[in-house]
Amino acid sequence: MHHRSYARPMPRYRRWFVPGGTYFFTANLARRDSSLLVDEIAALRAAYAEAAERQPFETIAICVLPNHLHCIWTLPEGDADFSGRWRRIKTGFSRRLPRESDPVPGRRAGERGIWQRRFWEHVITDADDLAAHIEYVHANPVKHRLVADIDDWPFSSWHRWRRSNLPGEVPG
């Protein structure tokens, strides 16, 4: 007797590449209990600045939390290589840390295991979508109960937005 399978194959995740587009990103550390991103904010700032120098992008908004970060970038016209930029940021940050920083067992040879291997991205579709994501980025420390008021979180472009509504660098 033949049994028909109704199981569906796992969908393959597909990235939507829009040259010159504006994107919302979330990048997570491998360990959810880690606070490396804020403990080592100088290393993150240096890696972020180096990546932006080598492959320019405009940071619209950013918020660094202990174990993940959210940001919104606009890429140069004709450029959709956000993956290369994230590779530079993650590698640059990891290389700046002491060897014993938050190791994750079970990684491939040569991998530090500081970051989750992937990141999440969303293409910003219009002005309302952009405004909603900027608000989400800046409100994240309150959402995670790290502070009661957005003004109290130092690792956010919120402070620059509040003063001038201009895009910022890595906060801290």
Which residues fall in each region the model found?
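Short catalytic/metal-binding and nucleic-acid-binding patches
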Residues: 1-172
